[in-house]
Regions:
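Short secondary-structure junctions
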Residues: 58-63, 179-187, 309-320
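Short glycine/proline-enriched loop/turn "hinge" motifs that connect secondary-structure elements
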Residues: 141-149, 281-283, 327
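Short histidine-centered catalytic/ligand-binding loop motif
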Residues: 39-43, 152-168, 289-297
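A carboxyl-terminal module marker
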Residues: 191-327
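Beta-rich nucleic-acid/ligand-interaction surfaces
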Residues: 64-93, 184-210, 321-327
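Class II aminoacyl-tRNA synthetase-like tRNA-binding/catalytic domains
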Residues: 2-145, 157, 212-240
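Generic alpha-helical secondary structure
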Residues: 43-51, 163-174, 297-305
Length: 327
């Protein structure tokens, strides 16, 4: 039976209190994100329906369910997960910094930094030789898209004396996941991928409505990450995966991520189980607007995207550069 683990942070509490007293643009943007609901907990939310479906699959029924802070350190988000110092995700144009060392977490994979340093979890690993967890949550997305997305990460660590984890184990878990969501007859393929915290990494694509669609990324836990958490890679091994709310959008035919956040009863009443299908509501048709402007060629476009969101807020699903001309 699954066990809920909530990891709280006094440091996060203090940072949020300090943030509430600030009125600068950066602080207002961060507060806007923190005020958004976590849809993995909201009834009639496609994201919660997806998560509930997953935790009831045979492999995941006994996994720990982990909740951890939304404001974390760069060490917890990047360093411990083997992220290079020059990785784009570390830039202030891609990540919300509260100060030099504290950020809004950018991915749920950062739960490793809390779960793998939890005393009771480590005691269980030593005693039983295996630990496993799922961590759902709301994370900050890149600044050109809707301001938040939901991600679900899975992690299994075990002693090699108990079993050696291979890429086949990784594929088996992903196939079970895909079949559990899309049905037993789903067609899939694997593509080699790369993540700083895993090796032998894979992207899984499924055939859906005549098109190949990426559904998740996964890999074997990187030995350096195990070392970073004080676990000897000669003794321990494991696998990990992660996917986002796009899975719910694909499965339920949701064309616009803003629909996932709606409280309109005409929308929320449509989502009852994993096989629910979205039907168009006239209030939410997608429209496109082109804007032309002259800017300094050295400007970072993420800053412009942020300004658009400051004014339009959740009316905007995505801002992107279509073309550029330099004279």
């Amino acid at each position: 039976m699954s066990r809920k683990i909530t990891i709280k942070s006094d440091e996060e509490k203090s940072l949020i209190e300090a943030l509430s007293k600030r009125q600068d643009v950066k602080a207002e943007r961060i507060k806007r994100f923190l005020a958004l609901p976590d849809l993995t907990k909201k009834e009639n939310s496609p994201v919660k329906i997806l998560f509930d479906q997953i935790i009831n699959l045979p492999t995941f029924r006994d996994f720990d369910l982990v909740e951890f802070p939304k404001i974390i350190t760069t060490e917890e988000c990047f360093d411990l997960l083997n992220t290079p110092n020059d990785h784009p995700a570390r830039k202030e144009t891609d990540t919300y910094y509260l100060d030099d060392t504290h950020i809004l977490r950018t991915h749920t994979t950062a739960f490793w930094s809390f779960y793998l340093r939890d005393k009771k979890v480590l005691e269980k690993l030593e005693k039983e030789g295996e630990i496993a967890a799922l961590a759902p949550g709301k994370d900050e997305i890149d600044r050109s898209h809707y301001p938040a997305f939901h991600q679900i990460d899975g992690l299994l660590i075990c002693k090699k004396s108990k079993r050696i984890i291979t890429q086949k184990d990784l594929k088996d878990v992903q196939v079970e996941l895909a079949k559990g969501i899309f049905g037993p007859d789903i067609e899939w393929k694997f593509i080699t991928d790369n993540f700083p915290y895993t090796f032998d990494s894979l992207e899984m694509d499924i055939m859906f409505n005549g098109n190949w669609m990426e559904v998740n990324g996964a890999g074997l836990v990187h030995p350096q990450c195990l070392k970073n958490f004080g676990l000897n890679p000669e003794i321990y091994n494991g696998w990990a995966f992660g996917f986002g709310d796009r899975l719910a959008m694909i499965k339920m035919g949701i064309p616009d991520i803003r629909i996932m956040w709606s409280n309109d009863p005409r929308i929320t009443s449509q989502f009852k189980d994993i096989n629910s299908k979205y039907k168009e509501v006239s209030k939410y048709p997608g429209t496109y607007r082109d804007i032309s402007f002259i800017i300094d060629k050295n400007i970072n476009l993420n800053n412009y995207y942020e300004i658009v969101r400051d004014f339009a807020d959740d009316l905007i699903e995505e801002v992107k550069l279509l073309d550029e001309y330099e004279n």
